[in-house]
Amino acid sequence: MEKQEGVIFTNWRVGQFNDNYETIFGQDFGFSVDPTTLVKLSIDKGNKRIFLKVMYAKTGMSTTQIADYNIRYAGPHLVVSDSAEPRLIKEIKMKGCNIVPTVKRSGSILSGIALLQDYDLIVDPDSMELIKELNNYTWATKGQTKPVPKWDHCIDAIRYAAQYVLVNRTKGAYTIR
């Protein structure tokens, strides 16, 4: 797959998923054009590696379908989701999914990108949607202050889950460069 010039993430490679580390799932909601995504993360804090596997990326999903897919793929594991739709999160939770909204603060996109850039990202070879995003996710401005809001659905899901594990629990124990 061809890589766009100036991609945000250069710290990734395709490799086998290893779920021997802390497991968490990230979710971004879409509907008609943008997909709803669920990404599994296995975080190796000691070696600063995050293993990534897209469980699904689908458009047009109903609340029941999202809940069913989440339960099938995530089981009892925590899913950290986009916080833009609290009613959807509540309905998914009521159907038995262990789901919480991400905490979006001012600057959370940039700090999440910086956090992910500090880790080696190992992408499961079957996660073609994520590979496509990583090859196309670029900065909107030369000053690298805002990414193009496209090619980011799996990436946003990853950011939500990684920030939950690595920032919210450690209260900012990483450095933004």
Where on the chain are the PLM-derived regions?
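Active-site-proximal flexible loops/turns
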Residues: 35, 89, 163
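Gly/Thr-rich phosphate-binding beta-strand-loop-beta motif of the actin/hexokinase/Hsp70
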Residues: 18-43
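ATPase catalytic-site recognition across NTP-hydrolyzing enzymes
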Residues: 1-27
